[in-house]
Amino acid sequence: MRDIVDPVFSIGISSLWDELRHMPAGGVWWFNVDRHEDAISLANQTIASQAETAHVAVISMDSDPAKIFQLDDSQGPEKIKLFSMLNHEKGLYYLTRDLQCSIDPHNYLFILVCANNAWQNIPAERLRSWLDKMNKWSRLNHCSLLVINPGNNNDKQFSLLLEEYRSLFGLASLRFQGDQHLLDIAFWCNEKGVSARQQLSVQQQNGIWTLVQSEEAEIQPRSDEKRILSNVAVLEGAPPLSEHWQLFNNNEVLFNEARTAQAATVVFSLQQNAQIEPLARSIHTLRRQRGSAMKILVRENTASLRATDERLLLACGANMVIPWNAPLSRCLTMIESVQGQKFSRYVPEDITTLLSMTQPLKLRGFQKWDVFCNAVNNMMNNPLLPAHGKGVLVALRPVPGIRVEQALTLCRPNRTGDIMTIGGNRLVLFLSFCRINDLDTALNHIFPLPTGDIFSNRMVWFEDDQISAELVQMRLLAPEQWGMPLPLTQSSKPVINAEHDGRHWRRIPEPMRLLDDAVERSS
C-alpha cells in the first residue's frame, strides 16, 4: 500500500537548515563534487540521513556498489537497493527503463553516483534532454533523483546547469579546500521555498558531513560590495589603500577567493600573452556562477593584448580592461568608476564559443591558393567575429629581378592566423585581426628587409565587403598560375673528425707530411 504522506528526503550534511537540505519526492537534484571519495562519503551520509521506513536505491557507475555503499546500524533505512551501471552514455538513457524492471519507483529516493568526469564528453544538448526526461519521469512516478557527479573540471558543466532550473530542483557543488570544503548552492527548491547563491563551509569528520559552527547562524552572506580583491601587481608595489582592499600574489589564488564573493570588485593582472586564455576561463566562470553584481576588471601590466584578446575578455564577462600605459592614478579612477554597476551583457554558457573568436583560423604560413581563399572566406562568413575587424588582405608584387617564389622565402609570419599564398606573380597575405593602422608594423615583423626593397606594388583590403570581392577575383585565377614554394635544398655536410670533451666539440688533429720518403732520400 502506497504512503499517504509525501516523503521528504534529506541531503547528508548535518545541521544544515531544511531550506537547503530537504528533497521532496517528485524532483531532480544535482551535486558536483571535486573528489570521488567525497562523492561516496556524501552518498553514504545521505543514505544514513533518511527515515527508517524510507525507500532508497543507489546506482553506482563503473564500480561495485556493495563495496562502497553501506548501511548504518544506528540510523537510516532498514535496507537499500543497489544497482550498478556501465560508464557509458547509453546506460544513462536506459536508466529509467532498467530501474522499473526491478522495482516500483514510487516514493523512492534514487542516488546516482557517477564515475569521475562521466559527463565530460556528453554534448550539452543531450545533457539537457536527459535532465528533461528524468524530471518528467520523477514527477510521473513521484520519486526523487539525486545525481552526485565527481570531477576535477566541473566549472563548464556547472555554468550550463545554471539555466536548467526547469528540469532541476536543486544545483550545488562541494569544493575541496584542504582542511574543509565549500558548499556552493546555486539554487535549491523544496517545500520550504527557494534559496539561491548560498556559500557555506562544511567539514568531514569520521565520515560525517557537518556545517562549520560559525556558519550555522548566518543564512545569507553579508554584503561585500565594498570589497576589492586584487592581484598585488595591480598596485605596482603600493600597500592596500584601505581596509576594503585585499591583495593576492597571483591570479589563481585571487580566483579561488573571488568564487566566495557576491558583489565585490575583482582586479586581475595580465603580464604576458600566455595568461589570456586561462584568465578568460576564470572570468567566464565567475561571471556565469557569481552573477551580474560582481565587478571584474583586468589590469594589463605589460603590453600583451591584441584587440581581439581584449574583445575576448570583455565577452567572457569583464567589466573593463585597463590598458598597460594607464598610470596608477588613472587605474584607480577606472576601478572606482565601475562601483555600483550591474553587468548587463549576455555571456554564452560555453566558453569555446568565445574562444573561437580569437583563433577561428588555426592556420599559419604558406597555403595553396584554393586553401587560402577558402580559409579567408570562412573568416568573412563567421557571424561571431566583428564586422570590418577580421583582418587585412595584402597583395604584394616583387620588384623586377626577384621571383615571387624567392620573395616567399623572406615571408616569415609568427602568429597563428597569418597565412600567405602565391599566384599570378603576386604574394598575397591575410593577417587575421590586424588593424589597418598597424599594417606597416606587422609587415616589418614578417619580413627581415624593408618591404619597399622587395616589392614594387602593394594593394590592401581591410573591410569585409572589399576582401570578399577580392576573393571572388582570386578564385578566377587558373590553377596553372598558382605558385608553389621553392624546393628545399639540402647541402651535404662533410664529416668532421672531432670529439666532445663534456663541454664542447674539439677537432682531432691529423698528422700530415709535406714530403714523402722518396723526396727525403733524394735530398
UniProtKB/Swiss-Prot annotation:
GO terms for molecular function: cyclic-di-GMP binding. GO terms for biological process: cellulose biosynthetic process. Residues 153-492 are annotated as: GIL domain, sufficient for c-di-GMP binding. It holds the Pfam family CBP_BcsE. Disruption phenotype: When the bcsEFG operon is disrupted in a cellulose-synthesizing strain (a strain K12 / W3110 derivative called AR3110 with a restored, functional bcsQ gene), cellulose is no longer made. Changing residue 415 to D: No longer binds c-di-GMP, does not complement a bcsE deletion in S.typhimurium 14028. Keywords: Cellulose biosynthesis, Nucleotide-binding. InterPro entries: BcsE. The keyword rRNA-binding does not apply. It comes from the Bacteria. Belongs to the BcsE family. The central domain (GIL, residues 153-492) is sufficient for c-di-GMP binding. Binds bis-(3'-5') cyclic diguanylic acid (c-di-GMP), the ability to bind c-di-GMP is important for its function. Cellulose production is abolished in E.coli K12 / MG1655 and W3110 due to a premature stop codon in bcsQ. This is Cyclic di-GMP binding protein BcsE.
